[in-house]
Amino acid sequence: MNLFATILIIMTTLSLVLALVSFWLPQMNSDTEKLSPYECGFDPLGSARLPFSLRFFLVAVLFPLFDLEIALLLPLPWGDQLNNPMETLFWAMTVLILLTLGLAYEWAQGGLEWAE
């Protein structure tokens, strides 16, 4: 038998054995408290249409912006190997200034204030 057929037979046998063992083993400690879902302190059996705070959404929108900032600035140390490293520095500073101005605007508008 070739290697592929041997590996296929071993994988099939092992899969069947593991599936049969999982059906034969009893459920240990099946308690209603352990079988209920855990939802981080929220009632899992309540309504799914609870109002969502807009503050969470605003913070969630700000996070990817600054995450992308880090991703854009990571290759910056390799920019000095280019023909014109000052152009790379110019565009990196432009991105930083735009994001800083956006953060200052959001802060001035009160978007980062949690309690009103």
From Swiss-Prot:
It is a multi-pass membrane protein. The chain crosses the membrane at residues 3-23, 56-76, 88-108. Its main location: mitochondrion. The keyword Amino-acid biosynthesis does not apply. The keyword GTP-binding does not apply. It is found in: Mitochondrion inner membrane. GO terms for biological process: mitochondrial electron transport, NADH to ubiquinone. It is an enzyme of class 7 (translocase). GO terms for molecular function: NADH dehydrogenase (ubiquinone) activity. Pfam families: Oxidored_q4. Keywords: Electron transport, Membrane, Mitochondrion, Mitochondrion inner membrane, NAD, Respiratory chain, Translocase, Transmembrane, Transmembrane helix, Transport, Ubiquinone. It comes from the Eukaryota. GO terms for cellular component: mitochondrial inner membrane; respiratory chain complex I. Its EC number is 7.1.1.2. It catalyses: a ubiquinone + NADH + 5 H(+)(in) = a ubiquinol + NAD(+) + 4 H(+)(out). Core subunit of respiratory chain NADH dehydrogenase (Complex I) which is composed of 45 different subunits. Core subunit of the mitochondrial membrane respiratory chain NADH dehydrogenase (Complex I) which catalyzes electron transfer from NADH through the respiratory chain, using ubiquinone as an electron acceptor. Essential for the catalytic activity of complex I. Belongs to the complex I subunit 3 family. This is NADH-ubiquinone oxidoreductase chain 3. The lineage of its organism: Eukaryota, Metazoa, Chordata, Craniata, Vertebrata.
